[in-house]
Amino acid sequence: MIKKKNISLFFKLLILSHLFVWTLVPYISNTNLPLDVIEALAWGSNLDWGFEKHPPLSAFFPEVFYQIFGRQDWAYYFLSQAFIIFSFFIVYKLAKEFLKNEVHAILSVFLLEGIYFYNFTTPEFNVNVCQLPFWALCVYYSWKLFEKQSITFKDCFWLGVFAAIGFL
């Protein structure tokens, strides 16, 4: 029998192992940051409202990390994984409400871990990685609106905020 405490522990271990592996392995094995990260750092140095290729949000977060951590490569790998595990958390929360079963919710995150875009491409913080949590939050708040079958200002507000941030 699987206990609720064990389920919670398994989820935490899954999240922490993803964070540890996908931050540490690229830091040890790569001799240079990925090109999209370097590009985002260059764009982030002047923080315009957009660039010829991408909206500004993917440059904003690396700049914040640069101001905090400086030229430490591991910090940018960590930034990328923080966005991924936050997405995992939102998917877990949505799956728990949708499936009404915590084991199935963890299984959904575990299956998500098997998708290429949630593991091998994640060391490179780019626009795709930056938008993942906001897409997940849009789906979560849309689900809340449909599931309740009543429209509340709070849910609409957060859906609008996360959709707008997702466009940035």
Which sequence ranges carry the predicted segments?
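Start-transfer (signal-anchor) and selected internal transmembrane alpha helices
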Residues: M1-W22, F153
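Membrane-interface transmembrane helices that cradle and orient dolichyl/undecaprenyl
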Residues: L99, C138-W158
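Membrane-interface alpha helices of multi-pass inner-membrane proteins
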Residues: N46, D155-L168
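Transmembrane-helix signature of polytopic, membrane-embedded enzymes
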Residues: V91-G114, L132-P133
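Transmembrane alpha-helices of multi-pass, membrane-embedded glycan-processing enzymes
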Residues: P62-Y66, L79-I90, I115, Q131-F134
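Short acidic/glycine- and proline-prone juxtamembrane loop motifs at membrane-interface regions
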Residues: F120-C130
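Extracytoplasmic catalytic/substrate-binding loops of multi-pass membrane glycan-assembly enzymes
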Residues: V25-A40, G50-V64, G70-A75
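Short helix- or helix-capping micro-motifs
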Residues: S17-H18, A105-E113, A163, F167
